[in-house]
A protein has these predicted regions:
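N-terminal hydrophobic/helix-forming segments and targeting peptides
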Residues: 1-173
Length: 173
């Protein structure tokens, strides 16, 4: 809960920030980066899916997302086809309607918690964000960056690091 944070940060986001979020606390001397994107699939033509990142999935696994028509919870369908003696993987989705092309679909979270462990697919991204938010509670002088596009497009970290460098020199140097 941000209302319990020791210092209220300046929030940078929106146009020009490549869907990233930057929190600036006090006079920054350090930075934490956590990426927010997930691996999964993008919807293509004829219910086909294209990989985003390096997901491994099996038929029957649940995928979630949203498009212009609403929320989506669909099922992954993995088929192996033989063409000219070569085995080829075909990825499709099962859903009651067509999903807008380009819509990202990620694995439905499946958190399993015991007294000693938490398990869910692709936990690294989620833990990075959670850890950064825990640090935010007591951070007085630093920057927390929630970056994007690490799974596709080369990521936003290089752009954000350059921006932070110019910001640091301009405001805090």
């Amino acid at each position: 809960k941000s209302k319990d944070w020791k210092v209220k940060p300046e929030l940078l986001h929106g146009d020009g920030f490549q869907d990233a979020i930057v929190l600036i606390f006090g006079k920054p001397r350090t930075a934490i980066f956590a990426h927010m994107d997930n691996i999964g699939y993008a919807v293509s033509y004829k219910k086909n899916l294209v990989r985003i990142g390096g997901p491994r999935g099996e038929s029957g696994w649940k995928l979630v997302g949203s498009d212009s028509k609403g929320e989506i919870e669909c099922t992954l369908k993995v088929q192996w086809l033989w063409a000219a003696g070569n085995k080829k993987e075909e990825l499709k989705y099962r859903f009651k309607r067509n999903i807008d092309r380009g819509t990202p679909l990620i694995f439905k979270p499946n958190f399993r918690e015991t007294e000693k462990t938490v398990q869910t697919p692709y936990l690294d991204n989620r833990l990075g964000v959670w850890n950064a938010l825990q640090v935010a509670e007591n951070l007085e002088n630093g920057i927390i960056v929630f970056s994007t596009y690490e799974e596709v497009g080369g990521g936003s970290v290089q752009f954000l690091a350059k921006y932070m460098s110019s910001l640091h020199i301009a405001q805090f140097g």
